[in-house]
């Protein structure tokens, strides 16, 4: 993929978690005939990004991402929490003007929503731009490069929300459908989503 340049964002797909509440690799779980991970990749409008990087502990997911043309990084210490995934991906795309941080367990997230987040950030490049529904923030979130040092300083299972809480004045919300922001942290959550599909 291309090198990052002015107002060109990278996209980091965070797919390295242990899914302890799910009981197994939840990203292999099926929804509407596809794995959660495949649906996450399908929601990425790759043309909007200078680079897409997938961080995972699972070789099969890294292989799928590589076949899709995306960069991959093995997280060999997922027990260190989401902060390690954030750090690995952020350092790999440190030359980008911003990075969209995307979880991989939102099967109803639409590529159009991701496009609108990137468009809004390009109009307001100093803002943290996040998907939201009726004012309630969700994922994904796009952070300008000025926040990379704080993101790289995160520890254990602390994610980008702790950075956002310190910079609420810089937050720009982009409206999304409520169901798009629903993440499948448990098998029960996935079954609920299937029942409402």
Locations of regions flagged by a protein language model:
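Phosphate- and divalent-cation-binding pockets in alpha/beta enzyme and binding domains
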Residues: 21, 60-64, 150, 183, ...
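Short, glycine-/small-residue-rich phosphate/pyrophosphate-handling segment
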Residues: 137, 141-167
């Amino acid at each position: 993929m291309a090198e990052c340049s002015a107002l060109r964002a990278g996209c980091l797909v965070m797919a390295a978690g242990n899914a302890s509440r799910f009981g197994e690799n939840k990203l292999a779980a099926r929804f509407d005939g596809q794995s959660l991970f495949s649906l996450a990749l399908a929601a990425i409008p790759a043309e909007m990004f200078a680079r897409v990087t997938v961080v995972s502990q699972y070789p099969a997911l890294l292989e799928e991402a590589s076949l899709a043309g995306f960069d991959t990084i093995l997280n060999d210490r997922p027990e260190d929490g989401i902060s390690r995934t954030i750090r690995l991906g952020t350092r790999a795309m440190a030359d980008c003007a911003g990075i969209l941080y995307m979880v991989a367990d939102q099967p109803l997230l639409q590529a159009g929503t991701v496009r609108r987040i990137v468009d809004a950030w390009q109009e307001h490049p100093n803002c943290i731009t996040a998907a939201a529904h009726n004012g309630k923030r969700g994922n994904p979130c796009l952070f300008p490069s000025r926040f990379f040092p704080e993101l790289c300083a995160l520890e254990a299972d602390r994610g980008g929300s702790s950075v956002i809480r310190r910079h609420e004045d810089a937050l720009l919300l982009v409206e999304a459908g409520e169901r798009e922001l629903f993440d499948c942290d448990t098998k029960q959550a996935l079954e609920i989503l299937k029942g409402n599909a």
